Amino acid sequence: MRDIPSHAGVDPHRRRLLTHLGAATLLPLLGRAGSSDATTPPLRPTRSPLLPPEHALRLPYATPASDAQLLREGLPIGNGRLGALCGGAPACETLFVSEGSLWSGGSNAVLQDDGQFAYTKEEFGSFMLLAKLFVELEGHAQAQVSDYQRELDMSNGCVRVRYRIGNTRYTRTLFASHPDAAIVLRLDCEGAGSHRGRIRLVDTHAGAGRADGRAGLRFAGQLDNGLRYAAALRVHSDGGRLETGDGLLQFHDCRGLTIVLCGDTDYAADGARGWRDATRDPLALARNRAQAAATVPAALLLDTHVADHRALFDTLQVELGQSSDAQRGLETWQRIQARAATPALPDPELEVAYLQFGRYLTIAASRDGLPTNLQGLWLENNDPPWMSDYHSDVNLQMNYWLADPSGLGACVDALTRYCLAQLPSWTRITQTHFNDPRNRFRNTSGKIAGWTVAISTNPFGGNGWYWHPAGNAWLCDSLWQHYEFTQDRDDLTRIYPLLKGACEFWQARLIAMEVTDADGSTRQCLVDDHDWSPEHGPENARGIAYAQELVWTLFGQYRQASALLGRDAAYAATIATLQQCLYLPEISPLSGQLQEWMSPTDLGEAHHRHLSPLMGLFPGHRLHPDLAPPAQLEAARKLLEARGMQSFGWACAWRALCWARLGDAERAYALVLTNLKPSIGHSNGTAPNLFDIYDLSQHGDPTLGGVFQIDANFGTPAAMLEMLLYSRPGQITLLPALPKAWAAQGRVTGLGARGGFTVDMAWRNGVPTQVSVRSVGGTRTRLSWGAQAHDITLARGQVLRVL
């Protein structure tokens, strides 16, 4: 069985998807389904869109996950609001269930004695588990089971468990439906057997749930911050008998069971309403959704989910070469370990699966709810590392580096909505608290305007840990780059207030400083006030490379937005003048590296995880080989070399992206493989379920272990795509950093390019053999590879076959 198929990129079923569903069916699913307040039932597909197993991209496993290791071994499902980790044990299916808005904490607007924000679970708050669901099956002990299989079917967006007891074949299918706003678990059997057991629904904050009629369970509660939450479960049985009592739902002699779980909170993304919707009854919503979905045949629930999922997942197809039959015959964890062995053959289909897993997580975690946090949408308990927050100094941004290049631009809207909803609170807190005399990062001019954030943010307008002056510019950059891919003026109009407010902050913050150049001449420059280069070095340095690069980029983006929208021309001219006066990082005469600080003697930690001074290389373009002076480019390369090739997952992903930008394919590829290596014990690397593991003991405390942090699951696939295509508005470069392992032959369709284009291409022996470009909003660009260059002009929707 080719669980990670060699022909994953050539899918005839993808081309027939619209035919199966009917365009009139598919498009309403994308437009309305899964809305948290939707009362109209989702439209249902008229034909099954389920991709057959031989064409689906699957991650197979030969054993169930243990409850104690569910975060490393459990398989994730999600619909953007509800997420679950699924264990797959025959005797007890365990689900750890989360709801994206279930957060403790609040605005956290009182500064500490040092002028910074409290950063504890009690004050800042934390992302929390909603429930644990246990489906216990009598007579299904592991010792009685044969032919056990468990898999994540990424193409169809579901988890399956299969096993045999005697002559009966048991199958489970689990998925989180966006159209039906529900988690669904379907149990089937073939043969003489049936299902007998009980269901427990546990509120992770207040204990067991209670019966809800003959075929349901439910609970409702309220966190200490007043946030109300609820979950409701409904069961439909094929034959047999259902009964409830003592907080349990028992089932007897059922040939099949459909279990539907829904959950909600009264969170509202509106600070003016106190981040609560007083009209919202989480229990009523959960019960109504569960009841509605439970009346729909399980196969139709699955078809509706698959249609919605595939409309996103199928936008990108990738082939990087063929793996061997022996590699295909391994289960996923064995395959990950085999790839890391010495010596080891390339396993390009495994690498494609890892890339597509990042896209699967994007679809599962980022739809119409809050954006992906440090753990995406998945938890094992109510005490996650760093409260599973929104870190603004690389992690939140990295969560979205994969989306637009991989055809999932629609998933970025969760980040846009989050920033827009938080903006009034961020602005108010900035203008009332940033210049507090206790804040060492305050504006020494005494001026204040616009908005910024702290390193950590929560969904209640709250900030945590240190102030992060340049965090506003980096968040704006993420939103601006989404516009670069889509060329959607409506999106640009939405983010314009964020761009302008960030510029206003920096207009008030920048200070004039006399700079002496290498030739002894002096000049006046504008520099960042006292600041901290994430996350090391002096905490009172001026003109840090990190902020200077981000502000230079922000000012350029705002000027373009102003011109495109025809707004605030006079203010844009002011920003242009400021941009021209900005100090930009220089080359240390001692190390030859790009300086992180204005002092040539301060090199900081040579191997530090952050690449803060290289913002102009990635995510920026100022230091790209096409644009940068050779001396600056070499200085950036030397700094990147000094940072090393070993770090945490997200830091290796960032390094890989930078090496791809520099055209060093083999170093970029080596870093991809570093992240793909198996996490043994607590080490950095990939867990059995492909989640990235972060070894906390490397922060100096050997008692700390490995934790899940999701950013590398997006950043590493983003680096893989960056190796295949580089783009900026007006320029698309094919195969800029193609490693030898992928050079023999490959294919990609639907690859996003800045400027408003998508690219399909195939290559052989490292050279493109087929190239097509489609406009999704762009009109002009230059397409190049090797010594070839083509100037392209297209109308929206037009496709040009270049080669």
Regions found by a protein language model. Give the residues of each.
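Alpha-helix capping and helix-loop boundary segments enriched in small/acidic/polar residues
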Residues: 345, 386-390, 403, 462-470, ...
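N-terminal secretory signal peptides
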Residues: 1-13, 23-25
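Short, glycine/acidic-rich hinge or "gate" loops at secondary-structure transitions
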Residues: 369-377, 494, 511-528, 567-571, ...
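Aromatic-residue-lined binding/catalytic grooves and analogous aromatic/hydrophobic interfacial grooves
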Residues: 41-463, 481-483, 500, 548, ...
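Well-ordered alpha-helical segments within folded domains of soluble proteins
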Residues: 393-404, 468-480, 546-556, 610-621, ...
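Non-catalytic carbohydrate-binding regions of carbohydrate-active enzymes
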Residues: 478-486, 490-491, 502-512, 572-604, ...
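Acidic/histidine-rich catalytic neighborhood
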Residues: 501, 505-561
